């Protein structure tokens, strides 16, 4: 489907940020491993998070869906799945459930769509081996499908920190249901806030995590079921905030907490540096802008999902925008550095691609771009449309993480149509 965005200005109103995708994944998986019943309130109901919910069900977990998800915890006693578990496009589910599969008896097979089957997994597979899990790529190339044989007993292991923080989160989530685990992080520790979110949810479910001198330690423990409310998502809110910054206006975004551990909250600092006015409350943010933006230099080492948003804002800004620290963005749904640069060039933007980012000279025009099947590209490029007009091909992919994206954008005055 095509998303056509018309020039829009003077955005105004109040809009609620959608629930956090990252926190929803972690909450439902940990609730599935807990003793007792948990209620996950205000979960993000989207393709990716439903992949995690359905993966939990494949291991015999009962989950009742409604306005909240009621999860009947297993206490770590998982059934062997009856069939291959298909995860769609959800890389988070793939990574987190690989270690969880090590808690089940016998074999589990995890796979997904064409994009998911290009996601690197070998560092996690190697790190699980010293902990008692035999896990391998069915094609012996480090990529899904992944075959996991249960047997996670615990122990000490090490893992590279420069490919995906989800590998670390994966082991930590399963760790308390073993004899105890030590994980030493080797090299550069990218996207650390995502691991902080994992630890946050683990501790909410009564499992402490120790981190010192580059090593995580988790002792044997029991997750305790509880009522958990999912906070708003700064990644998805970046499109709402970016829309106001780009088109101009004054908008209140609710459900964004000042004390959040989400690394993507840095988007507020970035748009402020570019020229927007940002006022933060305890649970909301007000963005005001004239639409006049200036280029910035940013390091997105801990917030790689912001790359498309910052790139398109840079294309609308006066002067140069430099983005660095995101080499790991090449291993997302697409090689986001390459695909972002290619689509910006379609719109007449001067882009220099770097190994870990890009340099953008502002000056985008309208036109037609392709999503490459990447939800974040599809949503980010709407911001150029608010100023110049744009058509985004294969845009329906936004449903992966933000199913009512067009409706929430139109709520604040953005003019767009999906057809």
Curated annotation (Swiss-Prot):
GO terms for molecular function: 3-phosphoshikimate 1-carboxyvinyltransferase activity. It comes from the Archaea. Keywords: Amino-acid biosynthesis, Aromatic amino acid biosynthesis, Cytoplasm, Transferase. It is found in: Cytoplasm. 3-phosphoshikimate binds at residues 21-22, 26, 164-166, 191, 305, 332. Pathway: Metabolic intermediate biosynthesis; chorismate biosynthesis. Pfam families: EPSP_synthase. It catalyses: 3-phosphoshikimate + phosphoenolpyruvate = 5-O-(1-carboxyvinyl)-3-phosphoshikimate + phosphate. This is 3-phosphoshikimate 1-carboxyvinyltransferase. It comes from Methanothermobacter thermautotrophicus (strain ATCC 29096 / DSM 1053 / JCM 10044 / NBRC 100330 / Delta H) (Methanobacterium thermoautotrophicum).
